[in-house]
Swiss-Prot record:
CDD domains: MPN_RPN11_CSN5 (cd08069)
Effect of residue 144 to A: No effect on CSN complex integrity and no effect on CUL1 derubylation
Protein known as: COP9 signalosome complex subunit 5b
Subcellular location: Cytoplasm; Nucleus
PROSITE patterns listed in its UniProt record: MPN (PS50249)
Domain of life: Eukaryota
Region (Disordered) residue spans: 338-358
Coiled coil feature spans: none
GO molecular function: metal ion binding; metallopeptidase activity
Pfam families reported for this sequence: CSN5_C (PF18323), JAB (PF01398)
Entry keyword set: Acetylation, Cytoplasm, Developmental protein, Hydrolase, Metal-binding, Metalloprotease, Nucleus, Phytochrome signaling pathway, Protease, Signalosome, Zinc
Main subcellular localisation: cytoplasm
Protein's organism: Arabidopsis thaliana
Amino acid sequence: MEGSSSTIARKTWELENSILTVDSPDSTSDNIFYYDDTSQTRFQQEKPWENDPHYFKRVKISALALLKMVVHARSGGTIEIMGLMQGKTDGDTIIVMDAFALPVEGTETRVNAQDDAYEYMVEYSQTNKLAGRLENVVGWYHSHPGYGCWLSGIDVSTQRLNQQHQEPFLAVVIDPTRTVSAGKVEIGAFRTYSKGYKPPDEPVSEYQTIPLNKIEDFGVHCKQYYSLDVTYFKSSLDSHLLDLLWNKYWVNTLSSSPLLGNGDYVAGQISDLAEKLEQAESHLVQSRFGGVVPSSLHKKKEDESQLTKITRDSAKITVEQVHGLMSQVIKDELFNSMRQSNNKSPTDSSDPDPMITY
């Protein structure tokens, strides 16, 4: 029962995150796992990304690396964590094959790598080479617990410094709190522009909720980097390792409740929503009683946009709460009802007691 439930849950997780299986009768399907040192060295020498700031457009992450990063991010709770990703490049695509955690000092808003983290990084990479894993470090990942996937000012500086000294390099951000609430992994992959570069107007990206106390940091730096399209893949060769890692993830998921575990996060979301409503209301009052007509019309559109975003945020909170409540009901029916039926004696009957007359 437990094994089948775990398998079903893992299949659901793979479907939720659109993880593709690369196995096929054609042997070329395994090329993604083959590391060609000659072509990678040639690519490093050619440096095509120097002539095109948008050269890298896609990221492929193995299911194993994704699950490792999610488990690591969830283990940190409300504290930020950090790790590195290993892989290779294939044209304009960065392929992440594996990931490992770093021993760093984290807070709720930032993460700091000390000397021991850099020593660990070097030793881990060298040991991997000795074990026949030739993939190089292709990026870093860290978590934003509860406030979305984007790069802060410190993240932009860190990523820009890494891109100057060890290209190609990628930044991945995971929100473990929203991952637990929504079920689907909340993740983003980014690369920064060089200083002084002005990017062209980009199409509107997928909307995400940004807390009011983070909006300024988000707005100031959002034009200094761009996001890459993220997809996932796996092979039947990963099945055993995925099973071992999934057991840890599955137990944590089954024994936790988004309604209880994310109580502080939900309270913070509602408080943030109230502040945004107050801000929108004050803007509406100002535009109603003052200003020239054209500017007031512009203000009205801006306020409508604000209200639209607030409506989206409130709908998202509602959906996540309903999702959490449904999961609790299902787990209650699945486990408690079975226990009650097992404890019920054979003489028990659901029929009503007969009437006794004297």
